[in-house]
Amino acid sequence: MGKKAKWFSSVKKAFSPDSKKSKQKLAEGQNGVISNPPVVDNVRQSSSSPPPALAPREVRVAEVIVERNRDLSPPSTADAVNVTATDVPVVPSSSAPGVVRRATPTRFAGKSNEEAAAILIQTIFRGYLARRALRAMRGLVRLKLLMEGSVVKRQAANTLKCMQTLSRVQSQIRARRIRMSEENQARQKQLLQKHAKELAGLKNGDNWNDSIQSKEKVEANLLSKYEATMRRERALAYSYSHQQNWKNNSKSGNPMFMDPSNPTWGWSWLERWMAGRPLESSEKEQSNSNNDNAASVKGSINRNEAAKSLTRNGSTQPNTPSSARGTPRNKNSFFSPPTPSRLNQSSRKSNDDDSKSTISVLSERNRRHSIAGSSVRDDESLAGSPALPSYMVPTKSARARLKPQSPLGGTTQENEGFTDKASAKKRLSYPTSPALPKPRRFSAPPKVESGGVTVTNGAGS
């Protein structure tokens, strides 16, 4: 409404006499000529007089639009005044040659000034509306061209792909969260059930420990049991890994230590240890020196006495007190029979055969007592190292025990009454096998002369 009021006020000012007077004064000041009659009087005279012979000009909207294309703003009052001023031709009067007179507008013939002004205003306003519609149409055309371009299509395709990927990732994350929540719920249910079972067991008193031992002792016992189980498993693994090696050694060894009916007979710890036992030079030297001294005193020991002495050693040795881990050393003490150095060759061969038969009988008895248990314990003792362990080395007490237990010593004679003669006879009743090459050879003792009897390694003279 404010714009319309301005338009009407500008039109009124354009057609008011005050504005015309001011315009005439401005024109007189510029040209130096004063017009006598006013414009209204001329208009009245022209309206009373007949119209001139000039043809009226037609109103063309296109010309107005072209003229106003550069001006995008709505028309102002100054433009309307200028248009009205330019449209009205000025005809000089005949009375005063320098006076400028305004003529009636020939553009709107037969119409009043108000109608002509209204037509002009409508024309200008319609041109403004047409320019605005053209501007909007140009914007739409540009937008359409931009949307139909290849760059826009590529961007739209990339945007759609990104949206699809984003939706897929969101669905996967949602599914994973649901699965994790379900797993957590299932785990919590299991924990609750386990806790409920533990509480029920505590209420019933099933897991109550009635022992008076402290917690540290109970834990120590459990730890010792666990360590014993692990040692047992290591021993079994060691025995299984060395089974083929011992089997090959038993096949290539002396057949006296084999049992054809039982292929695992030679698997006890005693035969394996005797087969792999190295020579102990210091102990052999001591035993040989003791044997030499005893042989110089008793040079007429026959075959039966040697066998009896071996039997006494086998029967009296298990009665001697020893620790749990000293058993292999005790076996070493009475399963390494020294051979008399002053006997002839035939008595030495028979003595070796008797000792072999006695060893085989004793090993058979030990094997009958514990077939699997002894093997496992022996494998456990050998699990530390495949060579001779440190605990198998004879100690001072074992060496001291070896000296009086020699077949020619005094201790064996004192313990002669405690031996089992029946068992000795039973052992000696087994048939002896023919002499075979011994797996171990002892060094020959030096030549000794005593009582007119000369004993050498081969024969006596």
Curated annotation (Swiss-Prot):
**Pfam family membership, one:** DUF4005
- Gene Ontology cellular-component annotations: cytoplasm; cytoskeleton; nucleus; plasma membrane
Per the Swiss-Prot or TrEMBL annotation, the motif Nuclear localization signal is positioned at: 425-432
Name the CDD domains on file: IQCD
Q: Where is the composition biased (Polar residues)?
A: 310-345
Q: Where in the cell is it found?
A: Nucleus; Cytoplasm, Cytoskeleton
Q: Where is this region: Disordered?
A: 1-55, 278-461
UniProt-listed InterPro entries? DUF4005, IQ_motif_EF-hand-BS
Query: Quick one: where's region Calmodulin-binding?
Result: 141-158
One of the record's GO molecular function terms? calmodulin binding
Q: Name all IQ domain ranges.
A: 114-142
Q: How does it assemble?
A: Binds to multiple calmodulin (CaM) in the presence of Ca(2+) and CaM-like proteins.
The record describes the protein's role as: May be involved in cooperative interactions with calmodulins or calmodulin-like proteins. Recruits calmodulin proteins to microtubules, thus being a potential scaffold in cellular signaling and trafficking. May associate with nucleic acids and regulate gene expression at the transcriptional or post-transcriptional level.
Q: Which family does it belong to?
A: Belongs to the IQD family.
State what protein this is by name.
Protein IQ-DOMAIN 2
Native source species: Arabidopsis thaliana
